[in-house]
Every structure is written in structure tokens, then in C-alpha cells.
Amino acid sequence: MHPFYTRAATMIGEIAAAVSFISKFLRTKGLTSERQLQTFSQSLQELLAEHYKHHWFPEKPCKGSGYRCIRINHKMDPLIGQAAQRIGLSSQELFRLLPSELTLWVDPYEVSYRIGEDGSICVLYEASPAGGSSQNSTNVQMVDSRISCKEELLLGRTSPSKNYNMMTVSG
């Protein structure tokens, strides 16, 4: 099998996890129909697969990580914007539906995110590299994020609370 097809096959789970995560924000706000959500998800999956196809390196998962990073920070990620346009969502509507600061890393074998510049990094998806070349031998598991990360999502925070005490130790 051609190496590109092997690489492309391995990114399916990672892309699906990232798209599902982003789509949940649209679903939670209830401003899109189920059909619009499906169209958005399918479009975003196709856009990400095309965008990543020459930047996916299962043998070196960190290589190309910056290129694959999905980022919202005062600017909308262009791929999310394109998928949203296909269902008629304007940039303004999209900014209301998604966190104002979101970083989503889509890497071979792991998808993780951070909401806010100071937020915790939470893992959405993990997989172990396959021993052989078969996709079936890959141990895949969706990770149920830590409670603190879930709470950030449910509370709609863009940054963690600054109400904390810092402990210092001097020797």
C-alpha cells in the first residue's frame, strides 16, 4: 500500500474527534439544525483531511503540529470559517457559538485542546501506534476529559478563574 494512503487512513479517528468537539459547541447553542450540523461536520472533515494530507507523519507525531493546529483567537480559523459558510453561518454568528480563544491540536495518535490562553490542556482522543500496518491493530480510545476541563466547557469560560491561591516553597 502507498505510504500516503496509510497515513491518510490513520488520521480519520483524529479528525473525527476534532470535528465532533467543534460541532458540539454548535449543537449546544441550538442555533443550527441537525442537517446543518451534519453538513458542517462533513465539510470540516473533508477540509481538514485535505489540509493535513501532506503534513501527517505518524512516525513523527510532533512534526507538522503547528500546521495542523486549529486556532481561534480574535481571528476565526479559516477551515472552520469555510465549513460554516457552507451552512450559511456568518463570522459573527460563528464567534458567538465558539469560544473566543480555542486551540485544538490534531496530531497523529492524539487530539487535545485548550480553552483560553491560561486554560488546562485536555486530551480528547488517544490512540497507540499500531504494531503492524493494520488499522485494526491500533488501540483507540476516546478520552473522557478531566472534570476540570468539562467544567470549563459547561460554564462557558474562556479562561480559568483567577481566584486561586499560590503556594510557594522556599528552602
Curated annotation (Swiss-Prot):
Keywords: Phosphoprotein. The modification Phosphoserine is found at residue 159. GO terms for cellular component: cytoplasm; nucleus. Coiled coil: none annotated. The keyword Thylakoid does not apply. One of its GO terms (molecular function) is enzyme binding. The keyword Transit peptide does not apply. It holds the Pfam family BTG. It comes from the Eukaryota. One of its GO terms (biological process) is spermatid development. Gene3D superfamilies: Anti-proliferative protein, N-terminal domain. SMART domains: btg1. InterPro entries: Anti_prolifrtn (IPR002087), BTG (IPR033332), BTG-like_sf (IPR036054). Anti-proliferative protein. Belongs to the BTG family. Interacts with CNOT7 and CNOT8. This is Protein BTG1. It comes from Rattus norvegicus.
